Amino acid sequence: MKQSLIFCFLLLTIIFASGYAAMPELESRIPSRCNCKAPPNSLPGLLCRKRCMAGK
């Protein structure tokens, strides 16, 4: 039981890490009109970029 829990945690960590590593690539696709003033890797920055990508 404990082993499967550890495995699950590792899997989630890997998925999260790979998604996070893809962020800079996403950054370059964001139109320049989205001048998000929050740091790109902070929550407000992420929300701002999401809104912008949605075209709002």
Swiss-Prot record:
UniProt keyword list: Amidation, Disulfide bond, Ion channel impairing toxin, Potassium channel impairing toxin, Secreted, Signal, Toxin, Voltage-gated potassium channel impairing toxin
Cellular localisation: Secreted
Signal keyword on record: yes
Expression (tissue specificity): Expressed by the venom gland.
Chief location category: secreted
GO molecular function: potassium channel regulator activity; toxin activity
Entry's Gene Ontology cellular component terms: extracellular region
Note: Negative results: does not show activity against Kv1.1/KCNA1, Kv1.2/KCNA2, and Kv1.3/KCNA3. Does not elicit any spontaneous pain behaviors after intraplantar injection in mice.
Function: Toxin with weak activity on calcium-activated potassium (KCa) channels. Causes a small reversible block of human KCa2.1/KCNN1/SK1 and KCa2.2/KCNN2/SK2 (IC(50)=25.1 uM) currents.
Protein name: Xylotoxin(2)-Xa2a
Native organism: Xylocopa aruana
